[in-house]
């Protein structure tokens, strides 16, 4: 579970103006269809999508607050940042610094997902399975790494 954070704490860490009202969350979600009450919606943009188009939907579904880029209209539940991608990276780095467990990274051109599954299975046989985390699917890129750290 992600550390609990608020729009005010995040604004302070990112050297942004402190929002007047505080909203707290412990989960980052980037798909507005998967928002639960209290989640924080991070409006990412890509070549084929723009999370900013779904901010209203995320808030209607119960998002505690939204992180958007500054060029999007702001209100008390929307924290504007220079780049939502950089904010995602910042949150993942912040979470990683707080984690004190052992981390195993698997690299290479081929076989990463198979190796991850095998290693996870072996470690789960030897240790408490609830203490073993393996990223879902093939989250072996920037976004997968960030989302793994924030899960």
Show the residue positions of the predicted features.
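N-terminal leader/targeting and accessory segments in enzymes
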Residues: 1-90, 94
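Phosphate-binding loop of NTP-binding sites
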Residues: 11, 88-151
């Amino acid at each position: 579970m992600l550390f609990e954070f608020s729009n005010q704490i995040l604004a302070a860490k990112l050297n942004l103006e402190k929002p007047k009202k505080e909203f707290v969350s412990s989960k980052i979600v980037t798909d507005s269809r998967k928002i639960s009450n209290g989640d924080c919606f991070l409006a990412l943009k890509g070549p084929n999508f723009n999370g900013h188009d779904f901010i209203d939907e995320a808030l209607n579904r119960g998002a505690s607050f939204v992180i958007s880029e500054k060029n999007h209209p702001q209100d008390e539940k929307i924290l504007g940042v220079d780049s939502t991608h950089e904010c995602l990276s910042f949150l993942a780095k912040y979470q990683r610094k707080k984690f004190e467990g052992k981390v195993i990274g698997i690299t290479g051109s081929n076989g990463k997902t198979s190796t991850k599954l095998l290693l996870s299975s072996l470690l789960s046989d030897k240790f408490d399975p609830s203490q073993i985390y393996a990223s879902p699917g093939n989250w072996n890129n920037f976004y997968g790494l960030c989302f793994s750290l924030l899960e």
